[in-house]
UniProtKB/Swiss-Prot annotation:
Name this polypeptide is given: Peptide chain release factor subunit 1
Subcellular location: Cytoplasm
Family: Belongs to the eukaryotic release factor 1 family.
NCBIfam families cross-referenced by the UniProt entry: aRF1_eRF1
Length: 415
């Protein structure tokens, strides 16, 4: 995924959650993926063909809904002068809203990563897999496994291992040939080992340096002892890559299977690195909490109050937080109320209820996502926002014990 703020990633994830929960009847939901190099004229022609074919659908209701969705897409495409550089995705169709009713709904997404394949898809649910893949971790790590006879170079991109190079050596075994002195043989062997290490270093540097320096998070080296230690001590990698070495790990294999073995051996280290910033922020919060310094706030009302007086230094929001601030108003007597509800994708809109003063029906006048509201307040006061995963104990505790909302303050406010 291209560089996104944590809040943009949250918004993208939330939007996909909402789409995932929408269901239609038969094949009434259309997903249209348009890559950046696709001509709009070609897309329009295919949609017109699909509209004609939809006339053959036996069910009148399904036929009407599918053709209506295609007409909606054609109408939108008329206003699209150029496909965005990452492509564009349209979702439209008759969504089941219960009580044997449907609602024609549409959503447009410009993805954070480029779309590579054109796709027109009709089903009872929206086709989301390519967009969901963009949410997956795309951090890149250099992988190198070696001994004195073989080396394999690869990359770990997200969760996928990509082998790049395999090298073999001409380093002689420990038994010398007849006619050579032991000293001479040992000298030749050490030269051959050094030359092989240099070949490995040059090849690995070429592969790893081709990765954008912002994406390459580190280098992992595996193999038997003392080979990997010798290679590391000899500084055969480019000097910029030497700074990125995260650790040396024991592996039995130095072929492609050795790359998988290396990733497994370094699994805990990789997970710690990915979560380190989050862990440090949450631990700082607990440290201040235990010290009773008064420089923490938690829960929606406390944190909101401190955000409003610009006293928040670090805002902690759980990645699993789903909450809305709902405003209801009585049009008869003017009574107004604000309240918060936790929500899950696909749940119905909050019931407004009746006015406690005059008994008239209340209407929902505003619904604001808590994450949007708090992120905007934090932005205004230059507070750092950290989205916290529940994949580690402290992150889970933040969600379960503190409602997914906490803050480290710049000073004790007493609020």
């Amino acid at each position: 995924m291209t560089e996104q703020s944590a809040h943009e990633k949250y918004e993208f994830k939330k939007k996909l959650e909402g789409l995932r929960d929408k269901k239609g009847r038969s094949t009434e939901l259309i997903s249209l993926y348009i890559p950046p190099d696709k001509q709009i004229f070609d897309v329009t022609n295919q949609l017109k063909d699909e509209h004609g074919q939809a006339a053959n659908i036996k069910s009148k209701l399904t036929r009407t809904n599918v053709q209506g969705a295609i007409e909606s897409l054609l109408s939108r495409l008329r206003y699209l002068d150029k496909v965005p550089e990452n492509g564009i995705v349209y979702f439209t169709g008759a969504v089941d809203i219960g009580a044997n009713k449907t609602s024609m709904e549409s959503e447009v997404i410009v993805p954070p990563d480029p779309i590579t394949v054109y796709k027109y898809h009709c089903d009872s649910s929206f086709y989301l897999e390519p967009l969901e893949d963009m949410l997956k971790d795309k951090n890149t790590y250099g992988l190198l496994v070696l001994d004195r006879r073989e080396a394999t170079i690869g990359l770990l991109v997200g969760k996928r291992i990509q082998p790049f190079r395999n090298l073999t050596s001409t380093v002689p075994g420990k038994q010398r040939k007849g006619g050579q002195s032991a000293h001479r043989f040992q000298q030749l062997r050490l030269i051959a080992i050094h030359d092989f290490y240099k070949r490995i270093g040059d090849a690995a540097s070429e592969v790893f340096m081709a990765v954008d320096h912002k994406d390459l998070k580190g280098v992992l080296i595996g193999g038997p002892s003392p080979t990997k230690e010798e290679f590391h001590a000899g500084e055969f990698l480019h000097h910029e890559l030497m700074k990125k070495i995260l650790g040396l790990f024991d592996t039995a294999y130095t072929d492609e299977s050795g790359l998988s073995e290396l990733v497994n051996a370094a699994g805990e280290k990789l997970q710690d690195l990915e979560l380190m910033g989050q862990k440090n922020a949450v631990r700082d919060f607990f440290k201040e909490l235990i010290a009773d310094s008064g420089k923490v706030a938690y829960g929606e009302s406390q944190v909101r109050a401190n955000l409003e007086i610009n006293s928040v230094d670090v805002l902690l929001l759980s990645e699993d937080l789903r909450a809305e601030r709902v405003t209801t108003k009585c049009s008869v007597c003017g009574y107004e109320n604000k309240w918060t509800r936790r929500w899950k994708p696909g749940e119905p809109a909050p019931a407004a209820g009746n006015c406690p003063k005059c008994g008239s029906s209340l209407e929902v006048t505003d619904v604001t996502d808590i994450v949007d509201e708090f992120s905007e307040l934090a932005d205004k006061s230059n507070a750092k926002v950290v989205f916290v995963s529940t994949d580690f104990d402290e992150g889970s505790q933040l969600m379960n014990a503190f409602g997914g909302i906490a803050a480290i303050l710049r000073y004790n406010t007493g609020v």
